[in-house]
């Protein structure tokens, strides 16, 4: 009786082991009937928004006189911008910043003896945001002509943006998805198999770089603002079942 029970237990164990092994083999086979590919979507585009910043600066021994001078210069800048087609709604002026400047003092022996107040430096930044990219580009280059009127003015390189990024992203995702499927079909057809439906999909990082530059792609995403002509790209990781 004990032998019969022993053989019965062994028999049941063997059956269970076979069932588990068969399931594992079937699952492994099914998991291999999948192909994963990465598709790329790229598109070149031209920025349609520009943001440009400049700064007016005045040096004065008297703070009140400095405010008067910078107000007069700001008026000339506003007039120049208006004459060149920039509306007041497109310009933002910052608060006037005031900094004390000091000069070194030396004793009769030529040794450093400390510092003393020399003059005030007052500065005011202005920023232009516009959809007329070409016009603002010209102004940013030619505004230095105000120097001949006694205005100390600085100009920074403009930043360029695009107002239809959401539409661009959707277009890139569509292109990347089609590219992924084309790649998968090419691989599968060469292997004599057939491609089924997509099982999983994941997006890569959205990148915007200069169209002609050598910007480096970043793991967290690149967003170039220094170039008017840009290139956008995104990758899509797709997995397809095989028929």
Regions picked out by a protein language model, each given a short descriptive name:
Residues 1-243:
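Short, charge-dense linear interaction motifs
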